[in-house]
Regions:
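Glycine-rich, flexible N-terminal cofactor/catalytic loop recognition
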Residues: 21-70
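Amphipathic alpha-helical protein-protein interaction segments
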Residues: 37-41, 46-49, 86-93, 97, ...
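Intrinsically disordered, low-complexity regulatory regions enriched in Ser/Pro/Gly/Thr
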Residues: 27-30, 47-52, 72-77, 107-110, ...
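Short polar/charged helix/loop
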Residues: 42, 61-67, 74-110, 135
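Beta-strand cores of modular interaction/reader domains in eukaryotic scaffold and signaling proteins
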Residues: 35-37, 55-58, 79-84, 115-117, ...
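PTP/DSP superfamily signal
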Residues: 1-15, 32, 98-114, 120-122, ...
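Short coil/turn segments at secondary-structure boundaries
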Residues: 48-51, 68-72, 95, 128-129, ...
Length: 190
């Protein structure tokens, strides 16, 4: 449960904003934009259309969630990748990360704007975006978390996800002496 007393104004503002731009589109690389947000973002077709969101990554455990087909029936064509996982420190995100970040990377490389969302845009979806930055931009966990928090101040992956992401960093970001030259990088985070 999130406690709202004593939260800094920027965190409250971020929690009330449906989605934030994490990586802008790149005209030179013809890549899409990466957004991070909450469930409320997908309930606003005007918002999705105004940001040209063409793909969703839904990181939820919500069998009641309406299908994306209902949104497509309204004239909006959205690709959807669903990751059913609880926001729990005991939930293991690792088995899902590689397929999820590759799916995101594929859409972005095709110039499709992607929104990664969970219920509140604080823990689950933030963890996926951080994993994406580690994997594609060779960022450390701390650097990726810092970038995402600068864009969406309310981000706070749960302790289990933090452990998973630190293991993910060790897997995909070998020690400096063993690092290959640039790999997988497609855009530069701002």
């Amino acid at each position: 449960m999130i406690r709202f007393d004593n939260l800094p104004p920027e965190v409250m503002q971020a929690m009330c904003t449906p989605m934030h731009l994490i990586l802008p589109p790149s005209q030179s690389h013809r890549t899409g934009a990466l957004y991070l947000g909450s469930f409320s973002a997908i309930l606003d077709p005007t918002l999705l259309t105004s940001h040209a969101v063409g793909a969703l990554v839904q990181v939820l455990d919500a069998p009641w969630l309406p299908s994306v087909d209902a949104h497509a029936a309204q004239g909006n064509k959205l690709e959807c990748y669903r990751l059913d996982i609880l926001d729990s420190s005991t939930a293991d995100l690792r088995p899902h990360l590689e397929a999820t970040v590759r799916w995101i990377d594929d859409r972005l490389r095709r110039g499709i704007n992607v929104l990664v969302h969970c219920q509140q845009g604080i823990s689950r979806s933030a963890a996926v975006v951080i994993a994406y930055l580690i994997y594609t931009h060779n960022m450390s966990y701390d650097a990726a978390l810092d970038l995402v928090k600068r864009k969406r101040a309310c981000v706070k992956p749960n302790s289990g996800f933090v452990r998973c992401l630190q293991e993910w960093e060790r897997q995909w970001r070998p020690p400096a002496g063993e690092r290959p030259s640039m790999r997988r990088v497609m855009t530069t985070p701002r």
